Design a protein with these regions (language model features):
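Conserved phosphate-donor/acceptor-positioning beta-strand/loop module used by diverse small-molecule
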Residues: 52-87
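C-terminal alpha-helix
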Residues: 127-138
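Small-molecule kinase domains that catalyze NTP-dependent phosphoryl transfer to phosphate-bearing small molecules
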Residues: 77-127
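Short, well-ordered beta-strand core segments
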Residues: 39, 55-57, 113-114
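Short loop/helix-cap segments at secondary-structure boundaries that form the rim of catalytic
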Residues: 46-53, 105-108
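ATP-dependent small-molecule kinase phosphotransfer cores
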Residues: 1-50, 75
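Short glycine-rich anion-binding loops that position phosphate/pyrophosphate groups of nucleotides
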Residues: 44-47, 61, 119
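Active-site cofactor/cluster-binding pocket
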Residues: 27-35, 66, 92-103, 134
Length: 138
């Protein structure tokens, strides 16, 4: 089970829903790190709020995401599927309300979108590096 799915993680998400300044402060700090350069960042908001960087969206079907989460967390497919559906809905609503972002559907800010369903982590990394080399970023 990942931290986000624990009681503490869920409580943290609830705080974010009612206190947008919490996320905005995290974003300010994240942008400072991005501006320093030479970093790899995983962020839901950075592709929309940062003008710099090579931005990648990792896409996956609900079925494959469910399988991967069930294997990683050793819980049932049904429980994983329900958690993913709730998390996706809550993320969409949160980022729409706080940022006007259509999270999960608007992929315009991304330099690359990869469907990871039939790829290993190594294949995903290799595809990203290849694209970065093609574009002259690497």
């Amino acid at each position: 089970e990942t931290w986000w799915d624990t009681d503490e993680g869920i409580s943290f998400l609830r705080e974010r829903e009612v206190n947008p300044e919490f996320d905005k402060e995290a974003d300010r700090r994240l942008l400072q790190k991005i501006k320093q350069g030479n970093v790899i960042v995983t962020s839901y908001t950075a592709p929309w709020i940062s003008k710099v960087g090579f931005k990648v969206w990792l896409d996956g079907s609900l079925e494959k995401r469910t399988e991967r989460m069930a294997k990683r967390d050793n819980i049932s497919l049904e429980e994983c599927r329900a958690k993913i559906i709730v998390r996706d809905k809550e993320n969409y609503e949160l980022y729409k309300r706080h940022y006007g972002i259509e999270f999960g559907t608007d992929k315009k800010p991304f330099d690359m979108v990869i469907n990871t369903d039939n790829l290993t982590a190594r294949q995903v990394a290799d595809a990203i590096l290849e694209k970065m080399k093609e574009t002259g970023i690497w």
